[in-house]
Amino acid sequence: MILDKVNSPEDLKRLSLEELLLLAEEIRSEIIRVTAQNGGHLASSLGAVELVLALHRVFDSPRDRILFDVGHQAYAHKLVTGRKDRFHTLRKEGGISGFTKVSESPHDAITAGHASTSLANALGMVLARDLMGEDYHVVAVIGDGALTGGMALAALNKIGELQKRMLIVLNDNEMSISENVGALNKYFKELQIRKWVQDAEKLGKNILERISPQLFGLVDRAKEAAKLLLHQENPFYAWGIRYVGPVDGHDLKGLVHILEHLKALDGPTLLHVVTKKGKGYKVAEADPIYWHGPPGFDPKKPEKVSKGYTWSQAFGDAVTELAHMEPRLFVLTPAMREGSGLVRYSLEHPERYLDVGICEDVAVTTAAGLALRGMKPIVAIYSTFLQRAYDQVIHDVAIENLPVVFAIDRAGIVGADGATHHGVFDIAYLRTVPNLQIAAPKDALELRAMLKKALEVGGPVAIRYPRDNVERAPEGVWPEIAWGKWEVLKEGTEAYILAFGKTLKYALEAAGDDPRVGVVNARFLKPLDREMLRALSRYKLLTVEDHQRMGGFGSAVLEALNEMGLKPEVQVLGLPDRFFEHGAIPSLHRQAGIDAEGIRKALAAMGVAVVHERA
């Protein structure tokens, strides 16, 4: 195999074009093989193989810096930069990351995971290069979905102003995770149509020259005028950025030729490359949304694998039903329709649904505008992505106490996506915001109750739930919930475990049938149930959460006890002050000491060693 001979990008420069083409197919096979075992971002990486090979053939990594936005498309990059022998560990605990990571390889120019960051990073690098008198190329590879992000567009504005030498490669596959939205996406499609027209014109060029040179000259002058008009329309020219394309992102020879030419140019240049997401794997080409990030599968008989009924689906079903009951309900998502469980909702209530693209800040402030005019918006968003709209939560929603509901998916440890995606900071950054209330349901039925009640409380509410399966709640059932009140699930005589969110199942498992240990579903963090907390203060208390210990639920409990002048023995379990890498969720919980075993150890340290009765 040719891949066996490739240990660094330098090895690509010694291969013939024919060998590079064979290598592309070998890389696709390896990507399919490993993602079939481990899961991962399959379709994006399959679509970028030729582009990655061309970039590493032309440029000199790691001296030249090649940045991959998000990192979904970087598997081929990992395979040709000395990590092929570890590629089988992709996304596994102790293995290589599913994204680019500076600490993993000198060829990874940035640590990625969130969208739209590559252009600002690249701008910083070219500024440093020029100030330090160095000479190397900086290439930022960004998808058409990530380019819709406000951070990317703002960076383009500055890149055009400063006119520094750099190359932007727009990898246009018409997708982010869901289908792309917005005016810029429509423009890219129009450019592709124009490219098709230009190709058709080539067919008639020689015919016109033979029939009438005069007629050909007239047509040629008209085309030059049209080109000038096109340049005036092109938004990249308006930014002061040279635009080249669109070109075929699977034409390896053509890509190498174009990149060699662009390498010699001064100033900022954008190369528009059109690729097919899932290229070379028929099922992924046909359904790039599902095969964007599938779980494990049989590569010989690839079929969609049921992930069971998830919290995301429970949320989607609940809001779809709620929208039939509440005509002012409106749901927004930042490019995560499928991931947030909103396919059904978007089909049944298209007029009250908005995908703003990869623009979390826009989602939150648009929700504020809706609320100001009497609507009841729900922002469906992952915990890790809500970080990107923190100012909007405060400035546009909370200050005016607007009735916006934040449905925070993927709260807590999320597993194989690792440090950039764990939702373990939202409690700390949200509970300090005045007016904003925070809750976490124990099951799908309680989620329905919280969503319905949240639309009635009159201010901002955050409801957080994990990446996990959950038992389906019956449709049409909307139980009442005592807002701000906790729930005792098991009485105890010596100690109580106060569990917030997902850790409740661990608390019940740890307590077992020991009569000394009680368990509380501490489902409301803000407001805390101070009445129950006061009543429980005569017992030993252990708080548990799937969140950073610092600033989390346990901290809130300690603050409340201090304010009430109560001093029970309290231990706080949560994530320590470090970033957790990728791995299986149960294993990462075990590392953090927040699983059932960790809870039992903490109880034992408090003098309450749990004893289970034998049947």
Curated annotation (Swiss-Prot):
Annotated cofactor note: Binds 1 Mg(2+) ion per subunit. Binds 1 thiamine pyrophosphate per subunit.
Top-level EC class as recorded in UniProt: transferase
Full protein name: 1-deoxy-D-xylulose-5-phosphate synthase
EC number: 2.2.1.7
Reactions accelerated catalytically: D-glyceraldehyde 3-phosphate + pyruvate + H(+) = 1-deoxy-D-xylulose 5-phosphate + CO2
NCBIfam families cross-referenced by the UniProt entry: dxs (TIGR00204), PRK05444.2-2 (NF003933)
Quaternary structure (record): Homodimer.
Pfam families per record: DXP_synthase_N, Transket_pyr, Transketolase_C
Family stated for the protein in its record: Belongs to the transketolase family. DXPS subfamily.
Gene: dxs
Metabolic or biological pathway, per its Swiss-Prot or TrEMBL entry: Metabolic intermediate biosynthesis; 1-deoxy-D-xylulose 5-phosphate biosynthesis; 1-deoxy-D-xylulose 5-phosphate from D-glyceraldehyde 3-phosphate and pyruvate: step 1/1
